[in-house]
Amino acid sequence: IRALKKEKTLGLSFAGTKDNIVGMAVAAGTKGYYFPVINFITKDLLTGFADELAASCKTMYVPDAKQFLHYMTDHKPQGVDAFYHQSLRDVSIGAYLLDPLTGSYPIEKIAGTYASKELPSYQDLFGKTVLEMASMQPSFDAYVCHQAAAALFCGPVIEKQLEEEDMSALYK
């Protein structure tokens, strides 16, 4: 955990439903770390950790800032701090700015477009299994880590293309 706080750029992905977090993945460099909600690792501990990481890194790429901010608002009911606006980058918003006619921007599609990586979707891996049950399967941690890694690797590519299109001010 201390090592992650020293990273300048991170990818982070929460796994959860609207009201529940089952885990969180953080990507740094070529490594991914998955933290499940289990035993002493609680939702509050994970959101607190995400809060610390957002404060300590220069840039944090996430697949879905709306989900991230929803969980963080639950963690900080008094309001989300302004530093999120400095460090947080939503790759789905960046992908939308570059190609607004696509319609939907799941991280699997973004990874294929901006990193030439094929990621399986939740449906591909777990079918109609509810999230809480899927999170107990051995492949779930890799699934969430791949989402965080995709955000980390696609983020700079998207930012570069936005700069080339003179749209980076819209993204940041």
Which sequence ranges carry the predicted segments?
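Conserved RNase H-like, two-metal-ion catalytic cores of nucleic-acid enzymes
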Residues: I1-T113
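Aromatic side chains
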Residues: Y33-Y34, Y96, Y114, Y122, ...
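Mixed-charge, glycine-rich, non-catalytic linkers/tails in nucleic-acid processing enzymes
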Residues: D81, P120-K172
